[in-house]
Design a protein with these regions (language model features):
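C-terminal substrate-recognition/cap domain of FAD-linked oxidoreductases
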Residues: 3-168, 172, 176, 187
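Hydrophobic, well-ordered secondary-structure elements that form the walls
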Residues: 146, 169, 184, 208, ...
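Basic polyanion-binding and macromolecular-assembly surfaces
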Residues: 177-183
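Conserved beta-strand termini and adjacent loop/short-helix elements that scaffold enzyme active sites
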Residues: 64-65, 183, 220
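Activity-critical C-terminal alpha-helical subdomain
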Residues: 187-225
Length: 225
């Protein structure tokens, strides 16, 4: 993962912007998916330089097959959502998550802190029954995601400790100069941590909210207000 991260940092620093950049470490191994689009000569130049970078950082070219398969299948979660939840009553949509044995966290951190953050998260989870089943970077090296699953088959222990583990890794991201959620938004789940993340900016948001909505009828309870 560290080698793929170094490659992502280098190509980003050079101004190379792949249409797809996905570095994933899971039970199947570690792969950096890259896909480019644009005019032929520009794409050829990007591909040539990126291959050099990946080899220099310890990578191996396994050909276009795995990335093309990934690209074809990337919509599956959206297809399932459309079939199972879209247009359904809220109770039906929410019941899909009942008793789920995973969580997906999406933090943004300074590039220089990402690898150290990963190591410190592993220490937080040690002995809790919670493990990282997938580490990933999407689009940019500072956008770091982790899928959390039970360390063993003990789902009860996992669920008992999950909230505390999530709280610790998210506040660690904040303490290291990052943010706790870059992908799906804060929602109500992370409401209680928003003031901690925004600092005095949260006071400004509160003042604006009170001025525009003095009786608090617009999305009450959101944004930690």
């Amino acid at each position: 993962f560290e080698q793929g991260f170094d490659a992502a940092v280098e190509l980003t620093a050079l101004g190379i912007r792949p249409s797809l950049l996905d570095l994933t470490e899971d039970e199947d191994g570690i792969r950096l998916h890259l896909l480019f689009e644009g005019y032929r000569e520009g794409v050829a130049a990007d591909v040539q330089r990126v291959k050099q970078i990946c080899v220099q950082t310890g990578g191996q070219d396994i050909g276009p097959g795995p990335t093309m398969e990934y690209w074809r299948d990337r919509r599956q979660s959206a297809v399932r959502y459309k079939a199972e939840a879209l247009g359904r009553p809220r109770k039906v949509r929410w019941s899909r998550w009942g008793g789920r044995n995973f969580d997906y966290l999406h933090m943004a951190l300074p590039v220089s802190k990402v690898l150290d953050y990963r190591k410190r998260c592993d220490l937080i989870m040690a002995g809790t029954g919670v493990k990282v089943a997938e580490y990933s970077l999407w689009s940019r090296p500072e956008l770091f995601s982790m899928m959390l699953r039970p360390d063993t088959g003990d789902g009860v222990r996992f669920r008992a400790n999950l909230a505390e583990v999530v709280e610790q890794v998210l506040t660690l991201a904040q303490d290291m100069g990052g943010i706790m959620e870059y992908c799906h938004g804060v929602g109500v789940k992370l409401n209680h941590l928003l003031a901690r993340e925004l600092g005095v900016s949260h006071d400004v948001i509160r003042d604006l909210k009170q001025t525009l909505d003095p009786v608090n009828i617009m999305n009450p309870g959101k944004l930690g207000l």
